[in-house]
């Protein structure tokens, strides 16, 4: 029983590592057996190609990820590291337990045409804003008319978001973030202007959330005695999860940022 307790504690300490790292030596023979293209037994469709230390998925929107094999487990070092228990491994078959507790059964491809699925090494980055979006609003405060502008600009800054297939396989999709320009005018006179990125919200959101979010939207809310009011939307791509951020720019052009309640 003493040996069992030590083993349980050892496994718990390994699984608690945030990066999914394991301290024991990886199985290089098992890794060598995994080299090649693997096809789903049920659909006969290529699922992934393993080359060296990297898994390449058939879906061109899924980013390649490094991996290791330790004992009977394959560790995938994606944006959110995961581990799959290996149920069966031979030179031509590979079965593993998905996160949905399904046994994924694969066999090694012997069809040369399957390699065509993996011809492109470039990941297809998903654009959340295909073109510049312009918005403007007019408000009146203390008998003065103010016009607030918003320009939502697509950028080349990449956001990696982990998603899961119906059968419980984790993949990283890549999206382009936005840079949003805001400015306030009184007549033809610009009172304030600045480019906004999600990095400006690092003090009010945890890094884990901010890393997978995009700066999705911005609205000019009005003017009062405190200054010019904007509200930003931070969203997780292809989900209903979002957070609102209130931004107040004082008449001295100092900005106050706080999470909307």
Predicted segments, located by residue:
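Bacterial signal peptide processing site
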Residues: 15-18
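N-terminal glycine/threonine-rich, aromatic-flanked beta-hairpin/loop signature
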Residues: 40-83, 171-188
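Surface-exposed beta-loop interaction hotspot
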Residues: 102-162
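Short beta-strand elements that form the blades of beta-propeller/WD-repeat-like
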Residues: 94-96, 146-149, 226-236
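Surface-exposed loop and turn segments in beta-propeller and other repeat-based domains
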Residues: 191-210
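Tryptophan-anchored aromatic micro-motifs
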Residues: 22-46, 120-135, 141
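Edge beta-strand at a domain terminus
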Residues: 20-24, 101-129, 238-261
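C-terminal motif of bacterial Sec signal peptides marking the signal peptidase cleavage site
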Residues: 10-13
